[in-house]
From Swiss-Prot:
Top class in the EC scheme: oxidoreductase
Job description of the protein: One of at least two accessory proteins for anaerobic nitric oxide (NO) reductase. Reduces the rubredoxin moiety of NO reductase.
The enzyme's E.C. designation: 1.18.1.-
Record's keyword annotation contains Protein biosynthesis: no
HAMAP family, per the entry: NorW
Similarity comment: family membership: Belongs to the FAD-dependent oxidoreductase family.
Protein's recorded name: Nitric oxide reductase FlRd-NAD(+) reductase
GO molecular function, one term: oxidoreductase activity, acting on iron-sulfur proteins as donors, NAD or NADP as acceptor
Amino acid sequence: MSNGIVIIGSGFAARQLVKNIRKQDTGIPLTLIAADSMDEYNKPDLSHVISQGQRADDLTRQTAGEFAEQFNLRLFPHTWVTDIDAEAHVVKSQNNQWQYDKLVLATGANAFVPPVPGRELMLTLNSQQEYRACETQLRDARRVLIVGGGLIGSELAMDFCRAGKAVTLIDNAASILASLMPPEVSSRLQHRLTEMGVHLLLKSQLQGLEKTNSGILATLDRQRSTEVDAVIAATGLRPETALARRAGLTINRGVCVDSYLQTSNADIYALGDCAEINGQVLPFLQPIQLSAMVLAKNLLGNNTPLKLPAMLVKIKTPELPLHLAGETQRRDLRWQICTESQGMVARGVDDADQLRAFVVSEDRMKEAFGLLKTLPM
């Protein structure tokens, strides 16, 4: 490979891929291009920065220069890729272009901001860069509105509350974590958040935001309103697909790839939050780690299909942490819930009494690995 491998992106997926390639081949040319600084940080830490009193720069684990030196890379930080010429095997920016033999899209996903009047007043916490842009406002805010009661929204609500802020969480669902599990399973965490002082506005809708002399006025449905100092959108992620679309690749929710992480173009692959693997978008660390291991082999000529086992998802709410696995969102499961002071074990079984999903909390989380082994592949 005279031109080697070009990777667009520098997040967790890109770094895992680099490490796995270098374990097998120390010499193949590797070029990384990204719009950010390319410094390494642990993205899940963003859910805890406020209670930990961390600044954006405190999150940096390794600088781009150290990364390049350690793994023998060509890095192009603060560089926006404008186009991919798939036929000519060329990646273009405004001032540069790069030939590739194999190209990997690791462009991640963007935080979705609800399209309401005043949406520009909403903050997002999807990257170190985004946190850096709003850390002063968040640190100084006494009253915080979090829009979205999913995984990230629940983590942030607890974190801001632990930091002593007045937190309101709004979601149009009837319970928190509604896309992940039924209300009878999430109710333990929901109750804990309420006990801590989080004001939950469920089955409610944000209709608009407006700057006032003393903060931000949030207008809600049913003629309600509340004034806050900061509003955070935690309404999910949308895979970044614009470049792939311009390159003529097949797109659905994400960049469509097969079990080999290959797109509709034989020399272009996708990895991480931007990828849709056989119809599934999996924006969690473990599937990305396993995908990076397989893709490294495939880029180096060892065709290996990705086989994902049942995997744990961790909800990092320290006052009441949860682990879950399996098809927790399936509507047809019957839930067997055992709750005690040390924690909860909720088992989701099908009509044949086969375990299909589980959620465990607090001290009962140590049972997760045993339950994981009994889930079907």
